[in-house]
Amino acid sequence: MIYVLYSPNCAVCKKVVRFFRNNQIEITKIIIGEDKIERSMLLDILSLCEDGFGTIISFKTESSKRLNITSKTFLDLSTKELLNLIQNDLNLIRRPLIYQTKNNRPYRLQIGYDSEEIEIFKRAVHEK
């Protein structure tokens, strides 16, 4: 299963959604600012991040500015606090975030749009 966490008004996010639609690859869309994600999904996403929360948190969003979360201050927060913050406000994460599971386990993560890197998701159709 492939999940795309995105904002509908983001041009890069639209490219990602269009890529999957054009290649007839089924995705589950999660709209940042409207939808919520389970804590277990967030933990699975983090398990694919080399730098943990630093990989997925955007320090440029209105939410991070409002909460005074910077690349330095987030280090003072506990894992539980960061999980709660992100679960309560998905606007804290970078977008688009593409998360793939295989056999119900975390498998692949891509943040942003790269026309070459995103091609790897075409294999998802054949890996079922």
From Swiss-Prot:
<dbReference type="InterPro" id="IPR036249">
    <property type="entry name" value="Thioredoxin-like_sf"/>
</dbReference>
<protein>
    <recommendedName>
        <fullName>Uncharacterized protein UU176</fullName>
    </recommendedName>
</protein>
<dbReference type="InterPro" id="IPR006660">
    <property type="entry name" value="Arsenate_reductase-like"/>
</dbReference>
<comment type="similarity">
    <text>Belongs to the ArsC family.</text>
</comment>
<keyword id="KW-0560">Oxidoreductase</keyword>
<dbReference type="Pfam" id="PF03960">
    <property type="entry name" value="ArsC"/>
</dbReference>
<keyword id="KW-0676">Redox-active center</keyword>
<feature type="disulfide bond" description="Redox-active">
    <location>
        <begin position="10"/>
        <end position="13"/>
    </location>
</feature>
<dbReference type="InterPro" id="IPR006504">
    <property type="entry name" value="Tscrpt_reg_Spx/MgsR"/>
</dbReference>
<dbReference type="GO" id="GO:0016491">
    <property type="term" value="F:oxidoreductase activity"/>
</dbReference>
<keyword id="KW-1015">Disulfide bond</keyword>
